């Protein structure tokens, strides 16, 4: 583990990996035309000058291109990953070293991330990314979040400072929340107004994923949201591309790297038929699997049926399937009692953001069950009768734990959305009172345009009379906000 020097604060696995990381970042830049175009367009204007951005998002090669784009537009950045298994250590090392530094003299961005963090280490990293030495509030003035953990820590800190105390960690309903409470009890003792002071200058947060957006809307509904937010997840160029096409690529990549089993001919159950579920189902069917969908929503269930999938309940198919993939963003989707009914060497994995879709705690409590590591993030669980299950990434994101996540081109869409959302919130605070917003349609369309040349796409141009006929401008936007792509 490589930690800070006097010149820079960071904590990564191994700085000597930086040259490898830099090579992969250079390759990724070619595949990320959206971010590179934004760098070129805004480099002179420096719209993020004065921004102190705390990022909590998977520390991958693609994220490295995002970080260096934010810096190129004038921002200062501190970063942590949003998942204990998703960091690519060579990417983290390259960011800590920076494009002009060396492993011996790092000169990059403060980053706190390594693959295989404990939960205690994970929340320490998040705290470090939120802690800005020698600044007026000791914190950021912008947050770029994925899953909402950085935003959650700030809000819980403010809540407990206002109450004068944080709950005892022993009362927590999960191991992870116990670590959060331990951290906040410590900060209450060290600096009783740390989070309140830190939150006072935050102009807003841009949120990457469905789960984090859900948290934001909940906080807004109950009146506890402290600063405005842009819901990047529901930008069309994010949800219809990253969620679908990204998962279509990375799910089978993760399964293949983890298990090397032939997917063709097997039966796979995909839980949920939203954008993520659609991409996962398509990828498994493309490999020749027979795919079964479970759904609570009649509209999504009808879509799945019309797309040719069997739609059933888990109870009906749990003993038949070979592969189970949760994609819902909900909790308790596969319980221990369900896993006890699965066939020998069934593969169980999750591609939703958090680790509570699969009941890992319940599985561990089964009398006589034995857990064994096959390789990092691949474990067998042997039942007393000899039956074995293969569980990927301990129920966390298998596409990032067992593989490298979504490919660069699709992440260029999402991260271009994030960059433009950061510029929007930071430069126009008067336009965004505290609420949850979606990315303006003209910016959504801009992100799509930035990726067309790379694919050889030529757009047809509306004639003025055609534009007038359908009630739009020649240059767009072309669809109303309520349009469903």
Swiss-Prot record:
Specify the pathway: Amino-acid biosynthesis; L-homocysteine biosynthesis; L-homocysteine from S-adenosyl-L-homocysteine: step 1/1
Lineage top rank: taxon: Bacteria
E.C. number: 3.13.2.1
Primary location class = cytoplasm
Which GO BP terms apply? Answer: L-homocysteine biosynthetic process; one-carbon metabolic process; S-adenosylmethionine cycle
SUPFAM superfamilies from the entry?
Formate/glycerate dehydrogenase catalytic domain-like, NAD(P)-binding Rossmann-fold domains
Q: Which GO terms describe its molecular function?
A: adenosylhomocysteinase activity
Needs which cofactor?
Answer: NAD(+)
User: Any idea where this protein resides?
Assistant: Cytoplasm
Q: Which positions in this protein are listed as binding NAD(+)?
A: 209-211, 243, 272-277, 295, 330, 351-353, 399
The record's section on InterPro entries has:
Adenosylhomocyst_ase-like_sf (IPR042172), Adenosylhomocysteinase-like (IPR000043), Ado_hCys_hydrolase_NAD-bd (IPR015878), NAD(P)-bd_dom_sf (IPR036291), S-Ado-L-homoCys_hydrolase_CS (IPR020082)
**EC supergroup of this enzyme:** hydrolase
How, per the record, is the cofactor bound?
Binds 1 NAD(+) per subunit.
Cellular component, GO annotation: cytosol
**Entry keywords, A to Z:** Cytoplasm, Hydrolase, NAD, One-carbon metabolism
Q: Please tell me where substrate binds in this chain.
A: 60, 146, 208, 238, 242
> According to its UniProt record, which reaction does this protein catalyse?
S-adenosyl-L-homocysteine + H2O = L-homocysteine + adenosine
| NCBIfam families in alphabetical order | ahcY, PRK05476.2-3
Q: HAMAP family from the entry?
A: AdoHcyase
According to its UniProt entry, the function of this protein is described as:
May play a key role in the regulation of the intracellular concentration of adenosylhomocysteine.
Family assignment? Answer: Belongs to the adenosylhomocysteinase family.
The name of this protein is Adenosylhomocysteinase
High-level lineage: Bacteria, Bacillati, Actinomycetota, Actinomycetes, Kitasatosporales
Gene designation per UniProt: ahcY
């Amino acid at each position: 583990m490589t930690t800070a020097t006097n010149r820079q604060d960071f904590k990564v696995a191994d700085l000597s990996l930086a040259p490898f990381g830099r090579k992969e970042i250079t390759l990724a830049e070619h595949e990320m035309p959206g971010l590179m175009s934004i760098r070129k367009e805004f480099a002179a204007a420096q719209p993020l000058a004065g921004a102190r951005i705390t990022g909590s998002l998977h520390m991958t090669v693609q994220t490295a291109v995002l970080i260096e784009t934010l810096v190129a537009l004038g921002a200062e950045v501190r970063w942590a990953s949003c998942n204990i298994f998703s960091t690519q250590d060579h990417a983290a090392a390259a960011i800590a070293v920076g494009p002009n530094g060396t492993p011996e003299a790092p000169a990059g961005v403060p980053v706190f991330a390594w693959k295989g963090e404990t939960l205690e280490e994970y929340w320490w990293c998040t705290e470090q990314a939120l802690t800005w030495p020698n600044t007026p509030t000791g914190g950021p003035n912008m947050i770029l979040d994925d899953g909402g953990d950085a935003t959650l820590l700030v809000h819980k800190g403010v809540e407990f400072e206002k109450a004068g105390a944080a709950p005892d960690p022993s009362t927590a309903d999960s191991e992870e929340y116990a670590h959060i409470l331990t951290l906040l009890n410590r900060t209450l003792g060290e600096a009783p107004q740390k989070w309140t002071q830190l939150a006072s200058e935050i102009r807003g947060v841009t949120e990457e994923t469905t789960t984090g957006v859900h948290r934001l809307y909940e906080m807004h509904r109950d009146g506890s949201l402290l600063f405005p937010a842009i819901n990047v997840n529901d930008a069309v160029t994010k949800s219809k591309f990253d969620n679908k096409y990204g998962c279509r690529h990375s799910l089978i990549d993760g399964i293949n790297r983890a298990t090397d089993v032939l997917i063709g001919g097997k039966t796979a159950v995909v839980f949920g038929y939203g954008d993520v579920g659609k991409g996962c189902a398509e990828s498994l069917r493309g490999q020749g699997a027979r795919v079964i969908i479970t759904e609570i929503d009649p509209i999504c269930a009808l879509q799945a049926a019309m797309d040719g999938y069997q739609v059933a309940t888990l109870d009906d198919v749990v003993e038949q399937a070979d592969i189970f993939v949760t994609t819902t963003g909900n909790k308790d989707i596969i319980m221990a009692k369900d896993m006890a009914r699965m066939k020998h060497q069934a593969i169980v994995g999750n591609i939703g953001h958090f680790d509570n879709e699969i009941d890992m705690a319940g599985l561990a409590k089964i009398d006589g069950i034995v857990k064994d590591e096959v390789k990092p993030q691949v474990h067998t669980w042997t039942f007393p009768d000899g039956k074995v299950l293969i569980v990927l990434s301990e129920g966390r994101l298998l596409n990032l734990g067992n593989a490298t996540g979504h490919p660069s081109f699709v992440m260029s869409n999402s991260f271009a959305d994030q960059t433009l959302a950061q510029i929007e919130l930071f430069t126009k605070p008067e336009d965004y009172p505290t609420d949850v917003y979606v990315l303006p349609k003209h910016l959504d369309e801009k992100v799509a345009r930035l990726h067309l040349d790379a694919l050889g796409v030529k757009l047809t141009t509306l004639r003025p009379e055609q534009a007038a006929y359908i009630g739009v401008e020649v240059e767009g936007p072309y669809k109303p906000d309520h349009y469903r792509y």
